[in-house]
Every structure is written in structure tokens, then in C-alpha cells.
From Swiss-Prot:
Ranges annotated as biased composition (Basic residues): 1-14
Record text on subunit structure and interactions: Interacts with histone H3 methylated at 'Lys-9'. Interacts with the cohesin subunit psc3. Interacts with hrk1. Interacts with the CAF-1 complex at the G1/S-phase transition and early S-phase, but not in the G2 phase.
Protein keywords: Chromosome, Nucleus, Phosphoprotein, Repeat, Repressor, Transcription, Transcription regulation
Biological processes annotated in GO: chromatin organization; co-transcriptional gene silencing by RNA interference machinery; donor selection; gene conversion at mating-type locus; heterochromatin boundary formation; heterochromatin formation; mating type switching; meiotic centromeric cohesion protection in anaphase I
Record-given protein name: Chromatin-associated protein swi6
PROSITE patterns: CHROMO_1, CHROMO_2
PTM annotation (Phosphothreonine): residues: 240
Bias-annotated ranges (Acidic residues): 71-81
Modification type Phosphoserine: residues: 24, 220, 227, 246
Locations listed in the record: Nucleus; Chromosome
Primary role: Recognizes and binds histone H3 tails methylated at 'Lys-9', leading to epigenetic repression. Involved in the repression of the silent mating-type loci MAT2 and MAT3. May compact MAT2/3 into a heterochromatin-like conformation which represses the transcription of these silent cassettes.
One Gene Ontology term of the molecular function aspect: identical protein binding
Biased composition (Basic and acidic residues): 51-70, 151-194
Length: 328
């Protein structure tokens, strides 16, 4: 053989043939180790970012829910008030029953005390029962009906015309009494003269002439005596002015309410009223005064009446509820 005609083949280790079966999957192109490692690192970091975003969103949501729960709890705590004691009671203006003056726990200022109806006091029934036990028990319904407070119009001052009529009537009565006294005096003098004429002069007067005191006195003394007689006739001694009865504390059992008719005849309530309890403003703007009498009874009247009947008690109530602001 000729050397020039021989071909030489170099077999490489990387050029192996791989036999591919019909059922086997095709072989994917191979990747370097560095590419695989970088791909895994990228996929792991993206997964961590997704998980961290999800955790941050869930934690922020929980914080918001906790904040809402705390705010709701604070609002509930702020709206809680506790009744410490029942101080007084009064008849309800509408719907019957009673209203109670409540003192709240932690509020010692009397102006913070409030009136509440019996229906609104369902949470302090034990305190209400204790209050009635201290005051001799709850009154029967029949008694409460008898003590209903009728409305009374405000007392009106007499007009100048009516006052003048009363004065004229009083002067007329006085003149009639003076005339009656003078008439009796004249009749008595006539009777004495008749007896003198029938029986004759008394002993010691032989001429039958009785010298009167006026005849023996000087003219100036006679004039003074005449003026005195006129003054005595104008003011007869048998006419005595009528005295008004002194006011007395109304004698009523406890837990009864005084009506305006029972106390309107008293000129002054200063010695009858124990205390002014509270003042209430009506829908028409007028003030209603609730007060307690010294016998334990309670009542309420317009301020136009109490200002005249017990002005000192009203002044004490206003002074006790004054608040002063310090100068900064």
C-alpha cells in the first residue's frame, strides 16, 4: 500500500455517540455549574421577597385590627359611669312614677348630679331599694295619686285701681265706726240730762247748777280740751287692727308633696323651706324651682314665686353653685 493513500483518524473522548431510543426523551443542552448556581440563587431570592411581602402585609393588617380593637375598648371604657348613691326623689312630670337624683362615682361636685327616670335606673335597682328603706319604704300608688300637683297661675299683684278701692272701703268702715261711737256718746248725754231733770241737783249744789270742768277752766284750756276730744273721736279705742296669724310649718307626713294652694297664704317661706334642691328650665324658657320643706315634704314652684317668698334661700343656692376662674 502506498503511504500517501492512508487516512488517519483521531478519536476524541468527547465525540462519543449516544444511542437514542425511540421512547426516550431528547437530551437537553447541558448547562455549566455557574449558570445553574446563579439560577437557583435568583429563584430563591424572588421566593423570599414574595414571602416577606406577604408577611409584611399580614402583620400590618393585624396591627390595624389590634388598633381598632383598642380604640373600641377605650370608647367603651370612657362611656362607663357608675352610680354611687341615690340622693333624692320627685314625681315624674310625664308617665307617672318617680325620678331620682343620682350621684356618680368619682364626681363629688353637686352640679354633676343628674335626675334620671325610674325606667333609666334599671342598673341601680339595689341602690333605689336601699334609698326607700332609709326613707320608710316606697309610698303606695293611691297616695301618689292624691298628691298630684295641680297647676296654679302665677300670683298677680293687685292693680292700682283695686288698691284704691280697698283703701276707700277701709276709710268708709272707719268713718262708720266713729259715727257709731259719737251717736252712742250723744245718747248717753241725753239720758244723763233726763235723769238730772227727774232727780234734781245732787247734794252740795243748792242752786241746782253743776259747774262743769270746762266752765271752771280758762278759754285756752277749753280749746285744748276740745282738740283732744276731736282726736279721741277720730281714733276710737274700741277699734283694734286685726293681726295676721303667724306662719307655721305645714304638718304633713313624710314623702308627701305640698301644693301651691297649701302654702300660698304664707307671706314668707324663709323659715319653712329647708333647702333649694335644683332648678329646671322648661321648654318655654321659664325656671321651675324644686325645694324641700322642713317637715320633709317636697314641691316645685315657678321662680317668680320663690324669688318673692324665699329670696335668701334662692341667693344661698346660687352662691353655692358659683364657679370662679383664676386670673392667669
Amino acid at each position: 500500500m502506498k503511504k500517501g493513500g492512508v487516512r488517519s483518524y483521531r478519536r476524541s473522548s468527547t465525540s462519543k455517540r449516544s444511542v437514542i431510543d425511540d421512547d426516550s426523551e431528547p437530551e437537553l443542552p447541558s448547562m455549566t455549574k455557574e449558570a445553574i448556581a446563579s439560577h437557583k440563587a435568583d429563584s430563591g431570592s424572588s421566593d423570599n421577597e414574595v414571602e416577606s411581602d406577604h408577611e409584611s402585609k399580614s402583620s400590618s393588617k393585624k396591627l390595624k385590627e389590634n388598633a381598632k380593637e383598642e380604640e373600641g375598648g377605650e370608647e367603651e371604657e370612657e362611656d362607663e359611669y357608675v352610680v354611687e348613691k341615690v340622693l333624692k326623689h320627685r314625681m315624674a312630670r310625664k308617665g307617672g312614677g318617680y325620678e331620682y337624683l343620682l350621684k356618680w362615682e368619682g364626681y363629688d361636685d353637686p352640679s354633676d348630679n343628674t335626675w334620671s327616670s325610674e325606667a333609666d335606673c334599671s342598673g341601680c335597682k339595689q341602690l333605689i331599694e336601699a334609698y326607700w328603706n332609709e326613707h320608710g319604704g316606697r309610698p303606695e300608688p293611691s297616695k301618689r295619686k292624691r298628691t298630684a300637683r295641680p297647676k296654679k297661675p302665677e300670683a298677680k299683684e293687685p292693680s292700682p285701681k283695686s288698691r284704691k278701692t280697698d283703701e276707700d272701703k277701709h276709710d268708709k268702715d272707719s268713718n262708720e265706726k266713729i259715727e257709731d261711737v259719737n251717736e252712742k256718746t250723744i245718747k248717753f248725754a241725753d239720758k244723763s240730762q233726763e235723769e238730772f231733770n227727774e232727780n234734781g241737783p245732787p247734794s252740795g249744789q243748792p242752786n241746782g247748777h253743776i259747774e262743769s270742768d270746762n266752765e271752771s277752766k280758762s278759754p285756752s284750756q277749753k280749746e285744748s280740751n276740745e282738740s283732744e276730744d276731736i282726736q279721741i273721736a277720730e281714733t276710737p279705742s274700741n277699734v283694734t287692727p286685726k293681726k295676721k296669724p303667724s306662719p307655721e310649718v305645714p304638718k304633713l307626713p313624710d314623702n308627701r308633696e305640698l301644693t301651691v294652694k297649701q302654702v300660698e297664704n304664707y307671706d314668707s317661706w324663709e323659715d319653712l323651706v329647708s333647702s333649694i334642691d335644683t332648678i329646671e328650665r322648661k321648654d318655654d324658657g321659664t325656671l321651675e324651682i324644686y325645694l324641700t320643706w322642713k317637715n320633709g315634704a317636697i314641691s316645685h314652684h315657678p321662680s317668680t314665686i320663690t324669688n318673692k317668698k324665699c329670696p335668701q334661700k334662692m341667693l344661698q343656692f346660687y352662691e353655692s353653685h358659683l364657679t370662679f376662674r383664676e386670673n392667669e
